[in-house]
A protein has these predicted regions:
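Short acidic, Gly/Ser-rich segments with clustered Asp/Glu that frequently serve as metal-coordination loops
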Residues: 17-21
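Active-site-adjacent betaalpha module
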Residues: 2-9, 42-43, 55-176
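A short alpha/beta connector and helix-capping loop motif
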Residues: 5-8, 24-54
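A cross-domain feature marking catalytic cores of carbohydrate-active enzymes
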Residues: 15, 49-52, 124
């Protein structure tokens, strides 16, 4: 099944100032999250971010804050009990997820979204945990649970559909 931009929402989980330095390959994960949010903006895909206890872990990184349409503060690891589903745009059943930590907040949120009937794509190169083992096991579990595991480039090209898209060159420059 292909992702469709007009049916998608980008969800960036906890790309926070005090959390990212602890994440394995945290700079690369943050860069990919910002790239995804930029692409979403160019293509009219709504972008929502979450922040886990922002008073302790700080706000999301500046690029994420600027590019997302909404930010949901939360205390649960799973963003759904804190109101995420109410914030998702109606009629968009494809949820594309990046962020941290893969094995905690992202995993629990993705599983709840699957349970709620959403189609979930997890962007592997835009997710991270402190431990690569935790990240890898979480991605495995998500795949076994019905989430589709993709990369930032896969998202970009599936959302654009063809090389004649008006933003093709802009997006190509972001991902190359």
């Amino acid at each position: 099944m292909l992702m469709k931009a007009d049916q998608s929402t980008l969800l960036l989980i906890d790309v926070q100032e005090r959390l990212m330095p602890a994440i394995s390959e945290g700079d690369a994960v943050a860069e990919r999250c910002i790239t995804l949010a930029t692409i979403a903006g160019l293509l009219g895909v709504p972008a929502i971010a979450t922040e886990q206890i922002p008073e302790k872990l700080g706000p999301n990184l500046e690029g994420v804050k600027e590019l997302c349409n909404k930010t949901l503060a939360k205390t649960h690891f799973d963003a759904c009990p804190d109101g995420l589903i109410d914030e998702l745009p109606e009629g968009r059943q494809h949820i594309v997820i990046g962020g941290c930590e893969t094995h905690v907040c992202m995993l629990q949120t993705a599983l709840s979204l699957l349970d709620a009937g959403y189609k979930v794509w997890v962007v592997a190169d835009a997710t991270g945990s402190r431990s690569e083992l935790d990240r890898d096991v979480a991605l495995d579990r998500l795949h076994q649970s019905g989430a589709r595991i993709v990369t930032t480039e896969m998202v970009a090209f599936e959302w654009m559909v063809h090389s004649k898209h008006p933003h093709f060159r802009d997006i190509q420059a972001l991902i190359k």
